[in-house]
């Protein structure tokens, strides 16, 4: 299993909308950056992803699970980019802010800090566990 972080602007797609999508999940589409799209292509069924609210809040608010691997993004008319399907797993009891991540020495090499414009990025196991603890998830 691999771990990831996926960013969404909450006024476009929020964790609450993801929850409402239920067990059938929802397409994670609209990614138009090649590096982020390549990360989507690497995702496997069962991988877990932090759900990050960008622009408004700038915080990790929940976890989603990949339930369908990469397929042609239905919102891409040129059919160059991919989407995955994810379903809600849990909300963090304590959202983990970008500010708190930046203050945590053990997380200083996260792509979230180093490549702040990247919308889909891998998270190493050690960082995943640290963020879970910060978010009060066992």
Residues covered by each model-derived region:
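Charged phosphate-binding loop/patch that engages nucleotide di/tri-phosphates or the phosphate backbone
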Residues: 123-138
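Short, charged, solvent-exposed linker or helix-capping segments at domain edges/interfaces
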Residues: 17, 95-101, 132-134
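Compositionally biased, charged N-terminal/linker segments
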Residues: 1-43, 137-138
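Short, acidic Gly/Pro/Ser/Thr-rich loop/turn segments
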Residues: 11-13, 93, 128-130
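Loop/turn positions that initiate beta-strands
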Residues: 46-47
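Short, charged beta-turn/beta-strand-edge "cap" motif at the junction between a beta-strand
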Residues: 52-58
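Short acidic/glycine-rich loop or secondary-structure boundary segments that cap or lie
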Residues: 14-16, 58-60, 74
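Aromatic- and Lys/Arg-enriched surface recognition patch
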Residues: 62-121
